[in-house]
Regions:
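Short beta-strand-to-loop elements that line the ligand-binding cleft
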Residues: 67-81, 111-114
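Short helices/loops that flank or line small-molecule/ion binding pockets
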Residues: 1, 18-19, 44-45, 75-95, ...
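Alpha-helix capping/helix-boundary segments
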Residues: 9, 58, 77-78, 96-97, ...
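Acidic, polar ligand-binding/catalytic clefts
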Residues: 1-45, 56-59, 113-116
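A ligand-binding cleft/hinge motif common to bilobed small-molecule-binding domains
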Residues: 4-15, 89-110, 114-117
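Extended ligand-binding regions for polar small-molecule ligands
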Residues: 35-40, 47-50, 55, 123-160
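Secondary-structure junction motif
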Residues: 41, 50-65, 94
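Periplasmic-binding protein-like
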Residues: 25-30, 102-141, 160-163
Length: 163
């Protein structure tokens, strides 16, 4: 039992999870918009806009606390709202947002070049598996040193782009 590709702070909310302290991936929290004049460089720059995000995208939920947010069940729903001008900006990872635009065949939506945030992602195990953390950490540290984690990420990215 556990979670994969989660931000470090998630254990504050889910206290039964324990982090494996080796980053296995990273996400770039990015802004997508139809208005080329919108170029936020921080979360607070979004305060004036109607913001769409996917429910459960914790980094986006935390970053937009107190703002005008519409949370949808899927990225497809978020980007359809943006396409129909129901929101001014969509928050998504660079990869997921770009893939959603491509899959839906949307035109006129672009990603702001500078991500709002780049976060390392980690494995988490349920507390009942806590005794495994030290061994898994050693294995992941070796994989990181040898470049194997990066190779796995590169291969996964290539496979996503070829589909």
């Amino acid at each position: 039992d556990g979670e994969v590709n989660r931000i470090r702070g998630i254990a504050k909310k889910y206290q039964s999870l324990r982090i494996i302290p080796v980053a296995i991936n990273a996400l770039k929290g990015s802004v997508f918009t139809k208005n080329s004049k919108i170029k936020p460089t921080s979360w607070k720059d979004l305060r004036a806009f109607r913001i769409g995000l996917r429910k459960g995208a914790k980094y986006a939920e935390y970053g937009t606390t107190g703002m005008k947010v519409i949370a949808a069940a899927t990225n497809k729903m978020v980007f359809r709202m943006l396409d129909r001008n129901r929101i001014d900006v969509a928050i998504s990872t660079a990869l997921e947002g770009s893939n959603t635009i491509r899959i839906l065949g949307l035109k006129g939506i672009s990603m702001v070049e500078q991500p709002l945030v780049t976060l390392e992602l980690f494995h988490f195990l349920h507390v009942k598996h806590e005794t495994l953390i030290a061994r898994i950490t050693i294995s992941l540290e070796a994989m990181a040193r040898e470049g194997r984690i990066q190779n796995i990420r590169n291969k996964a990215s290539e496979e996503r782009h070829s589909n």
